[in-house]
Every structure is written in structure tokens, then in C-alpha cells.
From Swiss-Prot:
Gene Ontology CC: one annotated term: cytosolic large ribosomal subunit
The keyword Ribonucleoprotein belongs to this UniProt entry's keyword annotation: yes
Function noted in UniProt: This protein is located at the 30S-50S ribosomal subunit interface and may play a role in the structure and function of the aminoacyl-tRNA binding site.
Annotated Gene3D superfamilies: 2.30.30.790
Signal peptide residues on this chain, from the entry's feature table: none
GO biological process, one term: translation
Species this protein is from: Chelativorans sp. (strain BNC1)
Keywords: Ribonucleoprotein, Ribosomal protein
Family: Belongs to the bacterial ribosomal protein bL19 family.
One of the record's GO molecular function terms: structural constituent of ribosome
Name the UniProt record assigns to this protein: Large ribosomal subunit protein bL19
SUPFAM superfamilies per UniProt: Translation proteins SH3-like domain
InterPro entries membership: Ribosomal_bL19, Ribosomal_bL19_CS, Ribosomal_bL19_sf, Translation_prot_SH3-like_sf
Length: 166
């Protein structure tokens, strides 16, 4: 493996350690949590729409999400390994036969709908995601409990030191 691919793989592993993205493909309805900076304030904004394409590979991998906002089509291209993408949630699995769904740009109304995939693979992916999300919630809850216990112990030690000095 050449040096550039090796460095890209290391960076991808570093980013993947911080957050995990679910397996999704074109046709899936996604909710992307994006960090937006306005002036000196930073907030997280949700962008929900249909994934119409995935392109690139390695650190340059992107996915395009399309939604209809106030009757106007809006598309955003998100880099998979961008630090601005906080989380991606699969709302529903779509059943499509194409890798690029650019034809949806010309469609309106019912013809732009994508039927839901209820096959075995979709069920397996949904179950795996639910399990991973439950584990993540349990891990976060355990971190909160550990932090609360550490804070309580620190507070008790400070009170004991204060009582000893009196």
C-alpha cells in the first residue's frame, strides 16, 4: 500500500473511532446532523432527505442528500469523514435499482416517491443499527454515571478536607 492510501486509512480510522456511521445506500431516507457555525455560535442542524448518490472512496467519499423544502428541491453533498457531520441516522430503507438517483430531480409528487425496502437485508441492517444505538446509549449513560460518582467523591473529599482544617 502506498503512503497516501496508508495515511488516508489512518485518518479514516481516527474519525471512525469518534463516531460510527450506519450502512446506508442510495434510496434510503437519512437524517444528517450537521454542525453549523453562525457568527460565534455553533449549533447542530438536522437535514433530512433521500440519499440520491454515493461517490468517491477513502477520505474523499461523499453522499448527496435531496429534500423538498417549501416546494423547492434542495441538495447537499456531505463528505462521509467530515468533522462537521455529527451523526447520520437512517429513517427508512428505500428499494431502488440504481446507484445514482439523479432522475428524481425531474420528478414531482407521487412519481418521486421511493418504496420502502422490507427485505431480509434491510431488517438485518435495521436490527444491527438499533442494537448499536442501544449500546451507544448505554455507554453514554455509564459515562454520565461515572462522571457523577467522580464529582460526588471529589465533593466529599473537599468537604472532608474543609472539616479537617476547622
Amino acid at each position: 500500500m502506498d503512503l497516501i492510501r496508508q495515511l488516508e486509512a489512518e485518518q479514516a480510522q481516527k474519525i471512525a473511532a469518534k463516531r460510527t456511521l450506519p450502512d446506508f445506500s442510495p434510496g434510503d431516507t437519512l437524517r444528517v446532523q450537521v454542525r453549523v457555525t453562525e457568527g460565534n455560535r455553533t449549533r447542530v442542524q438536522a437535514f433530512e432527505g433521500v440519499c440520491i448518490a454515493r461517490s468517491g472512496s477513502g477520505l474523499q467519499e461523499n453522499f448527496t442528500v435531496r429534500k423538498i423544502s417549501y416546494g423547492e428541491g434542495v441538495e447537499r453533498v456531505f463528505p462521509v469523514y467530515s468533522p462537521l457531520v455529527e451523526a447520520v441516522e437512517v429513517v427508512r430503507r428505500g428499494k431502488v435499482r440504481r446507484a445514482k438517483l439523479y432522475y428524481l430531480r425531474d420528478r414531482r409528487g407521487k412519481s418521486a416517491r421511493i418504496s420502502e425496502n422490507t427485505g431480509a437485508r434491510a431488517r438485518k441492517l435495521n436490527d444491527a443499527e438499533r442494537e448499536a444505538a442501544a449500546q451507544e446509549r448505554a455507554r453514554i449513560e455509564a459515562e454520565k454515571v461515572a462522571a457523577a460518582e467522580a464529582l460526588a467523591a471529589e465533593k466529599a473529599a473537599a468537604e472532608a478536607a474543609e472539616a479537617k482544617s476547622e
